């Protein structure tokens, strides 16, 4: 079947139209600062020493950077760190000119004034209060509790829940608290960069986590911004005949010589994308690594891009196209690239469709023959 035939479905046509009207997204990521107010166990930023040799840019460099990116055609920025909430003034400047999504640990509230629009806020959580305190708060700081307080009912906010493989039983109670707080949830998956092992070891797989995610989708279909398809691709590292790794990753700095050979291998990538260090003058290999082994990367942001840039692989059936289209739609909705208030009403229907069982063709053939 062709794309035109799939779009005869009114719901798919609506989703597709919303994405087309948003226009082409030209994105980058940037470290707003090289400093942070906590140290999470296994944080990719400090584990790969991304703070070393790239001090936070001066105001003059920051202003020049924004102007340069506007001229280059950038219209969407993923803001990471260090900890971006430490620089609220710079967040306001970014939101004046770009749509943006910021990742925060939640300890310091990002103010509302001057940041009412053009900004989505992903709040990190890694498990229940005890696990989060141990993994992110140094065993002392109740970051999850503070973040719940800071972002209660905040329309800009969603939870960016990094699931640790051996702690799948915590997913449902944590999501209950997030939803009760008035915030939707997107999932990420933990890479054991500190070699903690045992329950934290990503090599044990995320099958139990996926099952728990599917259960919270059933319970809160309007509040979970990850589909079963996205969850499977990210946590297994499989996309059709491709296995996740540097050779297929689509989000890397195209101006950095370390990636020039990768750009020649025929696999799709985003030609505009760059991952800027905190000095805003240099780029690194990709969003989440300098020398990191990509086998430990379960970053949902980069896997979103992997799926999105592989449309052709998803044209074999209406179900496959639906997997692709709903992935794109989720990314656009989370980041307010489409109208958020009307778009979020489609989330429950997206989950309903993706939870439908695909008919077993062999069984149907046997029935027809009898």
Outline where the language-model segments fall.
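Processing junctions and N-termini across compartments
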Residues: 30, 34-37, 243, 288-291
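Radical SAM enzyme [4Fe-4S]-AdoMet core and its adjacent flexible, acidic
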Residues: 119-120, 124-126, 130-276, 309-310
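Short loop/turn motifs at secondary-structure junctions
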Residues: 39, 73-75, 117, 181-186, ...
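Conserved alpha-helical substructure of the radical SAM core
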Residues: 2-105, 109-113, 317-328, 355-365
């Amino acid at each position: 079947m062709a794309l035109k035939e799939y779009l005869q479905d009114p719901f798919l046509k609506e989703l597709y139209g919303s994405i087309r009207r948003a226009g082409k997204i030209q994105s980058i990521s940037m470290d707003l600062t090289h400093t942070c107010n906590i140290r999470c166990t296994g944080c990719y930023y400090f584990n790969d020493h991304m703070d070393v040799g790239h001090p936070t840019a001066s105001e003059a460099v920051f202003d020049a950077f924004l102007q340069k990116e506007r001229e280059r055609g950038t219209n969407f920025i993923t803001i990471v760190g260090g900890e971006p909430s430490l620089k609220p003034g710079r967040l306001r400047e970014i939101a004046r000119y770009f749509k943006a999504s910021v990742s925060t640990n939640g300890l310091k509230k990002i103010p509302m004034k001057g940041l009412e629009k053009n900004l989505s806020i992903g709040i990190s959580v890694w498990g229940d209060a005890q696990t989060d305190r141990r993994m992110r708060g140094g065993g002392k700081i109740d970051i999850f509790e503070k973040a719940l307080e800071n972002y209660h009912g905040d329309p800009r906010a969603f939870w960016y829940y990094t699931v640790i493989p051996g702690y799948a039983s915590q997913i449902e109670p944590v999501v209950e608290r997030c939803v009760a707080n008035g915030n939707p949830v997107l999932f990420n998956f933990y890479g054991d960069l500190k070699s903690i092992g045992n329950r934290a070891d990503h090599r044990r797989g995320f099958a139990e986590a996926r099952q728990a995610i599917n259960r919270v989708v059933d319970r809160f279909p309007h509040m979970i911004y990850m589909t079963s398809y996205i969850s499977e691709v990210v946590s297994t590292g499989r996309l059709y005949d491709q296995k996740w790794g540097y050779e297929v990753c689509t989000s890397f700095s195209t101006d950095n010589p370390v990636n020039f050979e990768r750009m020649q291998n025929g696999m799709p990538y985003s030609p505009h994308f760059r991952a800027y260090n905190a000095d805003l003058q240099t780029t690194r290999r990709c969003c989440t690594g300098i020398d990191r082994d990509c086998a430990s990367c379960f970053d949902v942001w980069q896997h979103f891009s992997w799926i999105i840039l592989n449309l052709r692989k998803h044209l074999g059936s209406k179900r496959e196209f639906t997997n692709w289209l709903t992935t794109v739609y989720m990314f656009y909705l989370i980041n307010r690239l489409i109208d958020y208030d009307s778009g979020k009403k489609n989330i429950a229907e997206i989950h309903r469709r993706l939870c439908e069982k695909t008919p077993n063709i062999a069984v149907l053939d046997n029935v027809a023959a009898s």
